[in-house]
Amino acid sequence: MKMTLPDFHCAEVLVVGDVMLDRYWYGPTSRISPEAPVPVVKVNTIEERPGGAANVAMNIAALGANSHLIGLTGIDDAAHALSEKLRSVKVRCDFVSVPTHPTVTKLRVLSRNQQLIRLDFEEGFDNVDAQPMFERIEQALPHIGALVLSDYAKGALSQVQEMIKLANAAKVPVLIDPKGNDFERYRGATLLTPNLSEFEAVVGHCKDDNELVEKGTRLVKGLDLQALLITRSEQGMSLLSVDQPPLHLPTQAQEVFDVTGAGDTVIGVLATAIAAGKPLNEACFLANAAAGVVVGKLGTSTVSPIELENAIRGRAETGFGVMTEFQLKQAVVDARQRGERVVMTNGCFDILHAGHVSYLENARRLGDRLIVAVNSDASTKRLKGESRPVNPLEQRMIVLSALGAVDWVVPFEEDTPQRLIADVLPDVLVKGGDYKPEEIAGSEEVWAAGGDVKVLNFEDGISTTNIIKAIKNQ
């Protein structure tokens, strides 16, 4: 089973918001200035990239979709540079020129892959007449599959409620990357994509996943949204919807060089996937994979379809990820030939939470490779009751396979994985909870083959049951 990319070429997305130009000055530094205790950078490279809403539009175009951008600029060299850069990558620019204001520009000075300083050139557009933007939006709405409102608090979205109403009237999904702590102004949007600090600035600190789900669900209902996607840095993303259980996606970033523009990539890929026909949960999975790619690059960057394809398929194509039993057995044989110690655990993993992640990380530390065997939907229903599983097998396995601690994910139909364990014969069999080792399914077979059986504790107070109760109490 593999996640597939949609046909992005059939998607058309409109981006409206605060456009800006990101300028980068690069050079070596080898001495301190005699004028002040600051490094001296000898600039040898100058680079210009579209930023803010323009970076969102770039991300959409990079996927091969039709990207249309509306924003406010000055009449200056920065506006010209911005237009030229965007048109060169097939972004359709529809700027409203404001002669009294400069184009928002951010200048970053970097040396040895480190940002030393940022200089901002800007003047807010809050009091600029919004009617020309409304007219452009109305003309575009009949032709698009999604509208992105990219808010950097520079004034282009000072009349954001009117824009939301226009999109809702046209039945076009409107996705917003919010700014500030007044989320009331985004009432009626389809989805907001705040980062964790932006979210907690509105609802208060969340001590755990349960509280995050509770407060986020309340916010979704209170603002008449359809969903909320909270980006959580090294903790991945959490999708909270009106009529669906929470979906927690672990980060896929291998190395983080620069988070500049990562939020633009998330909302750009999310909107494009939705416009191309993907359901929200799959669109979020693609956005999460794209974020993992882009933070490994320096500066505002985009993700190509090939990079995204590699991000979602790379592990499976190199012998990792979701597998059939036949594929798993061969992968285990190959691992043992490399001298690797194989660990195996199992469970329903219906709503993945921090307790699960911690448990799986601890299990992985017992060896070199970790297998997670997952109960099928029918098996989960027999064990947990008619209301379960909340998430279907395919989604549960996709989320598990994205965890860095997990190497192989395989489904099984029985109530216990005893047959599967007997076939695989892991070096270490692990189970979470208060079991005795001899009570664990497959323990006798593993011991007979010379393996170990371990019991690990779960984190107290975190459980799927508690999360479900929190949702029902809303």
Swiss-Prot record:
Region Cytidylyltransferase: start-end pairs: 344-474
What are its E.C. numbers? 2.7.1.167, 2.7.7.70
**Catalytic activity, per the record?**
D-glycero-beta-D-manno-heptose 7-phosphate + ATP = D-glycero-beta-D-manno-heptose 1,7-bisphosphate + ADP + H(+); D-glycero-beta-D-manno-heptose 1-phosphate + ATP + H(+) = ADP-D-glycero-beta-D-manno-heptose + diphosphate
Q: Which Gene3D superfamilies does this entry report, sorted A to Z?
A: 3.40.1190.20, HUPs
A Pfam family that this protein carries is CTP_transf_like
List keywords of the entry alphabetically: ATP-binding, Carbohydrate metabolism, Kinase, Lipopolysaccharide biosynthesis, Multifunctional enzyme, Nucleotide-binding, Nucleotidyltransferase, Transferase
Q: Does the keyword Signal apply?
A: no
The source's domain of life comes to Bacteria
Q: List GO terms (cellular component aspect).
A: cytosol
User: Where do the catalytic residues lie?
Assistant: D264
Q: Where are the transmembrane segments?
A: none
Named in its record, the pathway it takes part in is: Nucleotide-sugar biosynthesis; ADP-L-glycero-beta-D-manno-heptose biosynthesis; ADP-L-glycero-beta-D-manno-heptose from D-glycero-beta-D-manno-heptose 7-phosphate: step 1/4; Nucleotide-sugar biosynthesis; ADP-L-glycero-beta-D-manno-heptose biosynthesis; ADP-L-glycero-beta-D-manno-heptose from D-glycero-beta-D-manno-heptose 7-phosphate: step 3/4; Bacterial outer membrane biogenesis; LPS core biosynthesis
Q: Which GO terms describe its biological process?
A: ADP-L-glycero-beta-D-manno-heptose biosynthetic process; lipopolysaccharide core region biosynthetic process
Q: Which GO terms describe its molecular function?
A: ATP binding; heptose 7-phosphate kinase activity; heptose-1-phosphate adenylyltransferase activity; phosphotransferase activity, alcohol group as acceptor
List the InterPro entries.
Bifunc_HldE, Carboh/pur_kinase_PfkB_CS, Cyt_trans-like, PfkB_dom, RfaE_dom_I, RfaE_dom_II, Ribokinase-like, Rossmann-like_a/b/a_fold
The annotated region (Ribokinase) lies at 1-318
Can you tell me which residues bind ATP?
N195, L196, S197, E198
Assembly mode: Homodimer.
The task this protein performs is described as: Catalyzes the ADP transfer from ATP to D-glycero-beta-D-manno-heptose 1-phosphate, yielding ADP-D-glycero-beta-D-manno-heptose.
Q: Which family does the UniProt entry place this protein in?
A: In the N-terminal section; belongs to the carbohydrate kinase PfkB family.
The record's annotation in PANTHER family points to: BIFUNCTIONAL PROTEIN HLDE
Q: What protein does this entry describe?
A: Bifunctional protein HldE
Q: Which organism is it from?
A: Photorhabdus laumondii subsp. laumondii (strain DSM 15139 / CIP 105565 / TT01)
